[in-house]
């Protein structure tokens, strides 16, 4: 109850002065007479007239009551049960649920002179039912048109690269701009999303060619770096082998093993001369 009372007080504070006045200050003598007759008619025809006076609105709705064309003091009524006087009172229902709509594709010229087609989606709801009825003829239609112009105005100040990379930030800026513009209508813009950015076919081909060239350039750089690293490793290995003859012989044996494994063959090679000389010398010394 406290929350509902706070909402009605805030609505009353935001209304123009003509809406804040009590109906008794603007009805005039004739209006008072009509209200009195309506009340007497209700009393005389009771309980039949009670069915004309009782109205019920759903949880997600609010009712704006007009008495002889003037909005009653207190703001929107509901949800639940409320009463009106027959003949003098009328009311309008306002749906308070969140509404979404698509922004049609808009042809936009970016800051760097590129023509693109952009569409989006907007989520909004009625925050103040009284303002939505009293200050605007059709809040939904006005919000849709304003969303289209806001999309063109915001994206027209951005480069193509910014539009493609900063979509969330641009959508947030649009949401803030729309929310401020529709505040006087009692509308709360909750979210804006940019759905699709369509580029011209020629620009798409140019961007694809640029991306392919960039990939090829990176591949060539990687291959060149690999060759450079391999040459450095070979240079270091050759220096080590040159300094150690035993390492050269070991490498020779490893190469023969690899060749034999690949060809599935047996390779016969003579023993090194220095090894034979060592064996013969050891035998002679043993016999002597």
UniProtKB/Swiss-Prot annotation:
Residues 265-273 are annotated as: Required for homooligomerization. Changing residue 264 to A: Reduced oligomerization and lipid raft association. Changing residue 263 to A: Reduced oligomerization and lipid raft association. SMART domains: PHB. Its main location: membrane. CDD domains: SPFH_stomatin. InterPro entries: Band-7_stomatin-like (IPR043202), Band_7 (IPR001107), Band_7/SPFH_dom_sf (IPR036013), Band_7/stomatin-like_CS (IPR018080), Stomatin_HflK_fam (IPR001972). One of its GO terms (cellular component) is plasma membrane. The modification Phosphoserine is found at residues 10, 18, 161, 244. Residues 1-25, 55-288 are cytoplasmic. Residues 273-287 are annotated as: Interaction with LANCL1. It is a peripheral membrane protein; Lipid-anchor. Coiled coil: none annotated. GO terms for molecular function: identical protein binding; ion channel inhibitor activity; protein homodimerization activity; RNA polymerase binding. The keyword Membrane applies. SUPFAM superfamilies: Band 7/SPFH domain. Detected in erythrocytes (at protein level). Widely expressed. Changing residue 272 to A: Oligomerization reduced to 18%. Reduced lipid raft association. Residues 1-22 are annotated as: Disordered. One of its GO terms (biological process) is positive regulation of protein targeting to membrane. Homodimer and higher order homooligomer. The homodimer is banana-shaped. Interacts with ASIC1, ASIC2 and ASIC3. Interacts with LANCL1. Interacts with SLC2A1. Interacts with SLC4A1; this interaction positively regulates SLC4A1 activity. Identified in large complexes with SLC40A1, SLC14A1, SLC29A1 and AQP1. Interacts with STOML1; may redistribute STOM from the plasma membrane to late endosomes. Regulates ion channel activity and transmembrane ion transport. Regulates ASIC2 and ASIC3 channel activity. Belongs to the band 7/mec-2 family. This is Stomatin. It comes from Homo sapiens. The lineage of its organism: Eukaryota, Metazoa, Chordata, Craniata, Vertebrata.
């Amino acid at each position: 109850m406290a929350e509902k009372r706070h909402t009605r007080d805030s609505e009353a504070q935001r209304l123009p002065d003509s809406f804040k006045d009590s109906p008794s200050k603007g009805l005039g003598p004739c209006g008072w007479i009509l209200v009195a007759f309506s009340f007497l008619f209700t009393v005389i025809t009771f309980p039949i007239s009670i069915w004309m006076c009782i109205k019920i609105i759903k949880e997600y709705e609010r009712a704006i009551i007009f008495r002889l064309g003037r909005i009653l003091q207190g703001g929107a009524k509901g949800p639940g049960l409320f009463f009106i006087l027959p003949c003098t009172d009328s009311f309008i229902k306002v749906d308070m649920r969140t509404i979404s709509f698509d922004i049609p594709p808009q042809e936009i010229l970016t800051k760097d002179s590129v023509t693109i087609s952009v569409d989006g989606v907007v989520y909004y709801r009625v925050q103040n039912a009284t303002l939505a009825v009293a200050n605007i003829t059709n809040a939904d239609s006005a919000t849709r048109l304003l969303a289209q112009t806001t999309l063109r105005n915001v994206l027209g100040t951005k480069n193509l690269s910014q539009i493609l990379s900063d979509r969330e930030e641009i959508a947030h800026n649009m949401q803030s701009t729309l929310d401020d513009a529709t505040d006087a209508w009692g509308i709360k813009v909750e979210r804006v999303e940019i759905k699709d950015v369509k580029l011209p076919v020629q620009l798409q081909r140019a961007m694809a060619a640029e991306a392919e060239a960039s990939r090829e350039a990176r591949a060539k750089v990687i291959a060149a770096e690999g060759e450079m690293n391999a040459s450095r490793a070979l240079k270091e290995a050759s220096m080590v082998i040159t300094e150690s003859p035993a390492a050269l012989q070991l490498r020779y044996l490893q190469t023969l093993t690899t060749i034999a494994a690949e060809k599935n063959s047996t390779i016969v090679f003579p023993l090194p001369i220095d090894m034979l000389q060592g064996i013969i010398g050891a035998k002679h010394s043993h016999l002597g």
